[in-house]
């Protein structure tokens, strides 16, 4: 019995380490993806709506083996409109994010998009009727205060483009809320397949409306790389959550901030201002507090 307990204790930490490693690798892949996306939209001036289409279109192609394994039968659902709404919101979030990367430095964009959990809390209270205690409201207020410090709306240099990462956080938060409402009544495979199948045509429609652009030469190669990085990063996320509890691996997702700051400095020479770290500290602290609070709530007996 003693040997079995020791074996069990040895296995659990190893799974936790593997989960953390996959999450860090996902963060690195997303950081490189953001560099490629910003290079395409900012340096090469490729239209952002078309950029979103090509990036996720190629990601869809790279995801076809996964989709084939699941089969289109996984799309069977009693809630098609709910799925359609969440994917439309996710697609609009992608459009806002890519347009944001075309206009603002990576470090600012990634810090602001990390406000998404706070929009989820607001939405959970308003639309799902979840109870939100004073501590969670305080954490949400702290997170938005951090975002305001980074945005500096009182500055003369603030432009509408700086709000795009916040808009993407709002849209992705709304999409996550609908996903949350589906997790108890739908299979994970169904939720995943609907996203994979619908995201590309929706992005395609938005690209056509904005003036469709076709990449060639080196630009096409960069979009292939962006699609591959998107598929790989999402796959690494799946492996992370499969290896260990989400509550354990989620804090490692916050490493995306320093990883993106480093990537922005290496490839674009961005040197973030000191106020970034103050605002980011508020956002990170509030996010970690909310996560720990959620863990305690889930562990309470019904």
UniProtKB/Swiss-Prot annotation:
It holds the Pfam family EamA. One of its GO terms (cellular component) is plasma membrane. It is found in: Cell membrane. The chain crosses the membrane at residues 16-36, 44-64, 87-107, 109-129, 158-178, 191-213, 227-247, 264-284. Induction: Negatively regulated by riboflavin, probably via an FMN riboswitch. SUPFAM superfamilies: Multidrug resistance efflux transporter EmrE. Residues 30-151, 170-291 form the EamA domain. Keywords: Cell membrane, Membrane, Repeat, Transmembrane, Transmembrane helix, Transport. It is a multi-pass membrane protein. Belongs to the drug/metabolite transporter (DMT) superfamily. 10 TMS drug/metabolite exporter (DME) (TC 2.A.7.3) family. Transports riboflavin into the cell. Can also transport FMN and FAD. Required for normal nodule development during colonization of pea plant roots. This is Riboflavin transporter. The lineage of its organism: Bacteria, Pseudomonadati, Pseudomonadota, Alphaproteobacteria, Hyphomicrobiales.
């Amino acid at each position: 019995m003693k040997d079995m307990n020791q074996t069990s204790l040895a296995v659990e930490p190893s799974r936790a380490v593997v989960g953390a490693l996959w999450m860090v690798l996902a963060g690195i892949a997303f950081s490189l993806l953001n560099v490629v996306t910003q290079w395409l939209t900012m340096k090469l001036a490729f239209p952002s709506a078309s950029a979103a289409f090509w990036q996720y279109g190629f990601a869809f192609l790279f995801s076809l083996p996964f989709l084939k394994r699941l089969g289109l039968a996984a799309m069977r659902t009693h809630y098609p409109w709910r799925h359609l709404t969440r994917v439309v919101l996710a697609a609009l979030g992608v459009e806002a994010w890519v347009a944001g990367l075309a206009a603002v430095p990576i470090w600012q964009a990634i810090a602001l998009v990390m406000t998404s959990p706070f929009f989820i809390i607001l939405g959970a209270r308003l639309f799902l009727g979840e109870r939100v205690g004073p501590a969670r409201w305080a954490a949400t207020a702290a997170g938005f205060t951090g975002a305001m410090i980074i945005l500096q709306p009182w500055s003369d240099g603030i432009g509408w483009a700086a709000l795009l990462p916040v808009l993407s956080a709002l849209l992705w938060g709304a999409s996550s809320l609908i996903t949350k409402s589906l997790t108890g009544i739908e299979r994970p495979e169904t939720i995943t397949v609907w996203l994979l199948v619908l995201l590309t045509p929706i992005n395609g429609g938005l690209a056509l409306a904005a003036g469709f652009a076709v990449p060639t030469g080196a630009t096409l190669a960069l979009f292939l790389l962006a699609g591959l990085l998107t598929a790989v990063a999402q796959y690494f996320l799946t492996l992370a959550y499969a290896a260990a509890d989400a509550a354990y691996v989620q804090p490692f997702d916050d490493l995306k901030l320093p990883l993106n700051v480093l990537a922005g400095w290496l490839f674009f020479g961005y040197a973030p201002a000191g106020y970034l770290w103050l605002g980011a500290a508020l956002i990170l602290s509030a996010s970690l507090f909310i996560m720990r609070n959620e863990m305690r709530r889930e562990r309470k007996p019904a």
